[in-house]
Design a protein with these regions (language model features):
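N-terminal small/polar loop signature for handling phosphorylated ligands or for N-terminal nucleophile
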Residues: 27-101
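Local beta-strand N-terminus motif with an aromatic residue
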Residues: 14-17, 73, 159
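Residue-level signal for short, function-critical loop segments
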Residues: 23-24, 127
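Conserved beta-strand elements of the Class I
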Residues: 18-19, 75-77, 122
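N-terminal, positively charged, Ser/Thr/Ala/Gly-biased leader segments
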Residues: 1-18
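A glycine/threonine-rich phosphate-anchoring loop and its flanking beta-alpha core
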Residues: 97-182
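Conserved active-site and cofactor/substrate-binding residues in soluble primary-metabolism enzymes
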Residues: 5, 26, 30, 34, ...
C-alpha cells in the first residue's frame, strides 16, 4: 500500500499536522482511518481541517490559515483531490502572511515574501486530474465578489511529497473519474 510511504515522509517534519480533507468521503472509504493511524503511530498531533469544498472559498482559507497559525502547524497534509491540495497550499502561504492573503496573492498577484514562513505541504491523492500535487498553484474562490482566481507561486510552495494510489479512486463515481482525464 503506497500509503505506507507516509511513514518515511513524516519524520522529516515537526509534531503538529493539519489534516485537510473534503466532505467526508475519505471517512466512508477508510482512507481517513488509515492516515490517522499512521499519523498517530508517528507521534503526530492532528489538527482537523475538514469540509474543504470544491473551489475552496476565501472564508475557508482565512479559517484554515488561522488554525494553522494558532496550532503552530509543522506540516499540512491534504488528503483528497485538487481542491484539497490547492487549499492546503494557499493555507501554507497565508498562515504567516503579514497582509490579507486574498488581497496580496489573488488581487494584486504578489508573490510570497522571502521572509514569510511557508508551512510544508504533503498530498495524498484520492482523485486524478488537476496536477495540483506537483505544482505551486492554488485556486481560491470569493463568492461575494464572484471571483475565482488561480495564482501560480514559486517552487517554495510546491508540495514536498505526493502519495498516489489508484485504488483510492475506485470508489469515485464514473463521471467524476472521467472528468479527471479530460
Amino acid at each position: 500500500d503506497s500509503l505506507n510511504y507516509l511513514n518515511e515522509e513524516l519524520p522529516r517534519y515537526g509534531k503538529t499536522v493539519q489534516l485537510v480533507y473534503g466532505g467526508g468521503s475519505i471517512k466512508k472509504n477508510g482512507i481517513y482511518d488509515k492516515v490517522v493511524d499512521i499519523l498517530k503511530a508517528n507521534g503526530k498531533v492532528i489538527v482537523e481541517d475538514g469540509g474543504v469544498m470544491p473551489n475552496p472559498t476565501v472564508e475557508k482559507l482565512y479559517e484554515g490559515a488561522k488554525l494553522a497559525k494558532e496550532a503552530n502547524v509543522d506540516l499540512i497534509l491534504a488528503v483528497g483531490g485538487g481542491s484539497c491540495c490547492d487549499y492546503a497550499k494557499a493555507v501554507s502561504i497565508s498562515a504567516h502572511c503579514k497582509e490579507d492573503p486574498w488581497e496580496k496573492y489573488y488581487l494584486k498577484f504578489e508573490d510570497v515574501d522571502a521572509d514569510t514562513k511557508i508551512i510544508p505541504v504533503g498530498c495524498v491523492l484520492t482523485m486524478v486530474g488537476t496536477g495540483s500535487e506537483m505544482n505551486g498553484g492554488a485556486v481560491i474562490t470569493n463568492p461575494k465578489s464572484k471571483l475565482k482566481i488561480g495564482h501560480v507561486f514559486g517552487d517554495r510552495v510546491f508540495p514536498k511529497f505526493a502519495i498516489l494510489n489508484p485504488t483510492f479512486t475506485y470508489s469515485l463515481p464514473k463521471y467524476q473519474m472521467a472528468a479527471g482525464f479530460y
